[in-house]
């Protein structure tokens, strides 16, 4: 079958109502426009795709050697979404209430939390077309894209992909090894990756449009309706799909602060506090406490002074200070800053009060009287006059809803009696003072993320649930709030998504929500950060997230111009109705959650009125660009997705306004300027043309997904029945698998019964299709010899050579002969970020170039000696230094490094062997220059022995240095926690300096 026939058959199957062979059974909706764009080009068509997904996979544990054979339950998706994950839903699935718990099962299954980015397989007409599309994909950020199949008589297939995936074991169905808070961190990281994945996808769409690719026009109203490529459109209410309808296309820039004085890493914090000194001769931000900081990340008790205008960061020298903590609050009262509560460690929740004298820089502990103030952290505070108001927080597992007032004049606590519209218990919320009121937004109540807004009147000591017009902010916690003139701002928070990449502003004069989008520079995570006002600038310090398998991420200090932000939010507010009155919602709780409960509405118009209707929707910011325009009633009508604001305004049975009389069609559609009509007149125009408001059918028509394992089981069951073979063979189906390049690797225990050999061809074909694999292999154990050879068996495919790209580096190796270390990604990236421009590096265990290539390609080392004794790894290493164009700076030394390694030449030595590299520590000391250098010592260490391992490394290397005649001082400067190697066994790397 030639290319055109295969393309026609594939496109016909895509448009068919029959489910396809993907786990879902149909195309992922977010990338349908992208797939249509590719398929519309005469040289390409897509064969498989995934827009990106977050999932929790339940997979049975390996069978024990017990003689009683238990039937495998099979693996399944406990949770899967192609959108940003809902942390509350994930937690409810993993930590069900007692009433929802299921009965224990005989054989527990492992649970793995995953994120997998976009991947698209595309068949190309010829090799030239393939090379062009691969280059385009790489330029858009899909750097791991490549040609997976070509040659004489073969179809030319490429894969568009990137490697921002994550996979974290979280326990099993009997016991989870993680906490709900840690699951939230995982979800936040995955959502961040999902957002990055979608931005790359949008960028790829724009790149296609800029290079001659066009969308099919089957759903287009006119040539201007290419909604996926509207990034270049100058209509202020139209954007590239990442922004909200009716919000500005322009982005508010974040200005990174250039820090001098103390290292900027001291501001790499979260859970800290910040207050401003805004005087005529002094405009600074005081930062205290938090987690992170310079060197080893830990809870801090440093007091820092930042001058944002010049970037000067100073450490306040103090005789005494509060203990190290995070999750506390800091409030300014006159010339004093009061720090209250926080968490010193998991078992030590604080309720102490400390005061910092701004003029002298001296701390003093305050002994308070009055009502008891229970310990708490993650609470919120606001100061009005001489009093500090505290609400909520967390004490161990208890979330509190109490309100306490500290009178700083007599240091007396008072608890406020609960009455009226009292907020529910919560933590990780935010609160600010405005006049004689304090305003509180969001938080987490233990079950739900909140988006309610309360005000507290300090005179009547009463709470009020506020009702505000405009687009309500998304629910969040661990965010920040600030007050600027007559505006309250909200920034950052969890869940991390594009919704938290906007600055939400509450106009208190008009009681109206507004928002502007922020131009994030480096995936800033404003989670548990601080927001401080100095003049017209918003200073955001710190914030970040942590994942034990992937390290920590902190945000750089930035500055945002609020004059520009407020002005832009006012300019881009969608027009408000002039004479359409909306009935007030009597139920405040219903109103505040309207965004989460609203239906996905569309407006249906006859095709002949579609262009006119689209212009109205665009002009008034009512067109929802996050959803797709589609045809209805056999193409006679066009359905436009509309915003929630429009859905509230538009009522088909509402009488036409008196200011607009029914007119003839020509008068309505010709010569009419949309700039000259009001909001209500525009609504009436739509009604005149027969506009109907419908639920988005395309949005709701979702099919039940089937996992690859389900597909495989069904296909193999059918084969066994046809061949008359016993169904007990299904016990040997793989419950999990890995991917090496385009090879899918199933476990060594799969398909081991000799009976399988009689139906190999049918079985391997079915497995390959169900797993979307071009090549299929069965894992063998890594040989426990010095070369750690792989025994991978290729089941489908010609050979085991694969290409893998990560951190911009290409690794090529024969998977049947060489093992590949997936878990060292963060360490490879760390080595690549070392300053090695003028250094000579010796890698004593080079392998295929795991660390050699980062040193050469990213760290720009002057020269690297690569020692390796596995001939298969050396073959791959030679290929890799050539493929990455660094062969002239790499000397490969084959053989035992104790014999081949150079002596007295290295500024840096890498010892990347686990479980222990101690056998080559003498060689490493000998390789260093006479004046010393740095050693990166790898090892597997029991978690309870980490500190003693560091001491052992220091002492042993010191003894070796003395024995070699080196009078060096040997110190461990840092211990990097790379990953968990096994339960309670950590892969560590000690950075050791010898001088």
From Swiss-Prot:
Gene Ontology terms: biological process: methylation; wybutosine biosynthetic process
Gene3D superfamilies on file: Kelch-type beta propeller, Met-10+ protein-like domains, tRNA wybutosine-synthesizing-like, Vaccinia Virus protein VP39
PROSITE patterns: SAM_MT_TRM5_TYW2
Catalytic reactions of this protein: 4-demethyl-7-[(3S)-3-amino-3-carboxypropyl]wyosine(37) in tRNA(Phe) + S-adenosyl-L-methionine = 7-[(3S)-3-amino-3-carboxypropyl]wyosine(37) in tRNA(Phe) + S-adenosyl-L-homocysteine + H(+); 4-demethylwyosine(37) in tRNA(Phe) + S-adenosyl-L-methionine = 4-demethyl-7-[(3S)-3-amino-3-carboxypropyl]wyosine(37) in tRNA(Phe) + S-methyl-5'-thioadenosine + H(+)
Spans of repeat Kelch: 284-335, 336-386, 387-436, 437-486, 488-535
Broad enzyme group: transferase
GO MF, one annotated term: methyltransferase activity
Keyword flag Ubl conjugation: no
This protein's pathway: tRNA modification; wybutosine-tRNA(Phe) biosynthesis
Keywords associated with the record: Kelch repeat, Methyltransferase, Multifunctional enzyme, Repeat, S-adenosyl-L-methionine, Transferase, tRNA processing
Function noted in UniProt: S-adenosyl-L-methionine-dependent transferase that acts as a component of the wybutosine biosynthesis pathway. Wybutosine is a hyper modified guanosine with a tricyclic base found at the 3'-position adjacent to the anticodon of eukaryotic phenylalanine tRNA.
Protein name as annotated: tRNA wybutosine-synthesizing protein 2/3/4
């Amino acid at each position: 079958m030639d290319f055109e026939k295969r393309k026609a058959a594939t496109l016909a199957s895509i448009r068919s109502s029959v489910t396809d062979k993907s786990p879902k059974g149909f195309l992922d909706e977010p990338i349908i426009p992208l797939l249509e764009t590719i398929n519309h080009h005469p040289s390409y068509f897509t064969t498989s795709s995934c827009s990106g997904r977050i999932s929790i996979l339940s997979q049975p544990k390996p069978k024990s050697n017990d003689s009683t054979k238990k039937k495998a339950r099979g693996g399944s998706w406990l949770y899967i979404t192609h959108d940003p994950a809902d942390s509350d839903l994930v937690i409810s699935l993993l930590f069900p209430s007692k009433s929802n718990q299921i009965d224990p099962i005989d054989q527990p299954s492992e649970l793995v939390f995953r994120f997998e980015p976009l991947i698209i397989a595309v068949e190309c007409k010829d090799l030239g077309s393939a090379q062009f599309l691969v280059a385009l994909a790489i330029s858009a950020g899909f750097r791991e894209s490549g040609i997976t199949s070509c040659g004489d008589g073969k179809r030319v297939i490429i894969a568009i992909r990137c490697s921002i995936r994550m996979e974290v074991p979280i326990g099993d169905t009997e016991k989870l090894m993680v906490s709900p808070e840690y699951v939230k961190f995982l979800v936040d990281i995955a959502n961040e990756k999902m957002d990055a994945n979608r931005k790359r996808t949008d960028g790829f769409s724009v790149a296609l449009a800029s290079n001659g690719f066009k969308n099919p026009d089957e759903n287009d109203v006119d040539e201007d309706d290419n909604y996926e490529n509207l990034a270049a459109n100058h209509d202020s209410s139209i954007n590239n799909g990442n922004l909200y309808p009716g919000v500005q296309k322009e982005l508010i820039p974040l200005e990174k602060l250039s820090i001098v004085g103390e290292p900027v890493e001291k501001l790499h914090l979260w859970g800290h506090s910040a207050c401003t000194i805004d005087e005529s001769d002094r405009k600074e931000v005081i930062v205290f406490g938090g987690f992170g900081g310079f060197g080893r990340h830990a809870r801090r008790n440093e007091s820092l002074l930042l001058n944002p205008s010049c970037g000067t960061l100073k450490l306040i020298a103090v005789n005494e200070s509060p203990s190290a903590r995070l999750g506390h609050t800091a409030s300014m009262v006159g010339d004093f800053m009061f720090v209250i509560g926080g968490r010193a460690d998991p078992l030590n929740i604080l309720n102490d009060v400390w005061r910092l004298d701004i003029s002298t820089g001296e701390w003093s502990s305050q002994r308070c009287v009055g009502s008891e103030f229970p310990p708490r952290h993650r609470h919120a505070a606001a100061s009005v006059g001489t009093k500090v108001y505290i609400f909520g927080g967390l004490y161990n597992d208890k979330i509190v809803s109490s309100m306490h007032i500290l009178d700083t004049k007599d240091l007396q606590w008072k608890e406020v009696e609960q009455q009226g519209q009292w907020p529910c218990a919560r933590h990780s919320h935010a609160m600010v003072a405005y006049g004689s009121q304090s305003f509180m937004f969001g938080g987490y109540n233990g079950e739900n993320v909140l988006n309610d807004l309360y005000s507290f009147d300090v005179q009547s000591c009463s709470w009020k649930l506020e009702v505000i017009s405009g687009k309500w902010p998304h629910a969040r916690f661990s965010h920040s709030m600030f007050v600027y003139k007559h505006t309250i701002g909200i920034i950052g928070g969890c869940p991390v998504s594009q919704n938290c990449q906007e600055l939400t502003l509450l106009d208190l004069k008009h009681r109206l929500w507004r928002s502007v989008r922020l131009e994030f520079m480096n995936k800033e995570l404003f989670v548990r950060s601080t927001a401080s006002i100095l003049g017209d600038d918003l200073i955001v310090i710190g914030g970040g997230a942590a994942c034990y398998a992937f390290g920590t991420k902190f945000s750089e200090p930035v500055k945002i111009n609020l004059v520009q932000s407020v002005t832009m939010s006012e300019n881009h507010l969608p027009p408000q109705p002039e004479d359409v009155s909306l009935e007030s919602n009597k139920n405040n709780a219903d109103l505040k959650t309207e965004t989460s409960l609203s239906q996905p509405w569309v407006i249906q118009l006859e095709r002949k009125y579609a262009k006119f209707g689209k212009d109205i929707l665009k002009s008034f910011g009512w067109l929802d660009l996050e959803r797709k325009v589609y045809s209805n009633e056999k193409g006679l009508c066009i359905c436009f997705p509309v915003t929630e604001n429009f859905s509230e305004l538009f009522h088909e049975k509402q009488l036409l306004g008196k200011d607009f009389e029914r007119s003839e069609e020509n008068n309505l559609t010709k010569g009419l300027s949309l700039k000259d009509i009001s909001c209500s007149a525009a609504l009436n125009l739509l009604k005149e043309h027969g506009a109907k408001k419908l639920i988005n059918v395309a949005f709701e028509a979702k099919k039940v997904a089937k996992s690859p394992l389900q597909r495989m089981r069904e296909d193999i069951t059918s084969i066994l029945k046809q061949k008359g073979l016993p169904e007990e063979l299904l016990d040997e189906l793989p419950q999990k698998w890995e991917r090496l390049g385009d090879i899918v690797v199933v476990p060594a225990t799969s398909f081991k019964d000799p009976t399988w050999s009689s139906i190999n061809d049918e079985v391997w074909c079915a497995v390959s299709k169900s797993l979307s694999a071009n090549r299929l292999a069965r894992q063998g154990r890594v040989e426990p010899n010095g070369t750690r050879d792989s025994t991978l068996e290729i089941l489908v495919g010609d050979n085991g050579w694969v290409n893998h790209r990560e951190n911009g580096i290409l690794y090529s190796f024969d998977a049947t002969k060489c093992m590949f270390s997936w878990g060292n990604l963060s360490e490879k990236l760390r080595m690549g970020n070392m300053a090695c421009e003028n250094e000579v590096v010796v890698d004593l265990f080079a392998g295929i170039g795991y660390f050699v290539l980062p040193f050469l390609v990213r760290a720009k080392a002057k020269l690297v000696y690569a020692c390796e004794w596995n001939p298969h790894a050396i073959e791959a290493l030679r290929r890799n230094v050539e493929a990455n164009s660094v062969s002239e700076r790499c000397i490969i030394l084959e053989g035992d490094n104790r014999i081949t390694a150079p002596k007295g030449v290295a500024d840096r030595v890498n010892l990347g062997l686990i479980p222990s590299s101690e056998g080559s520590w003498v060689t490493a000391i000998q390789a260093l220059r006479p004046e010393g250098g740095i050693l990166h010592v790898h090892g597997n260490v029991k978690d309870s022995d980490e500190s003693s391992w560091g001491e052992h490394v220091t002492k042993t290397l010191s003894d070796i240095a003395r024995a070699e005649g080196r009078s060096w001082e040997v110190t461990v400067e840092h211990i990097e926690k790379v990953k968990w190697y096994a339960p309670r066994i950590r892969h560590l790397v000690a950075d050791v300096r010898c001088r």
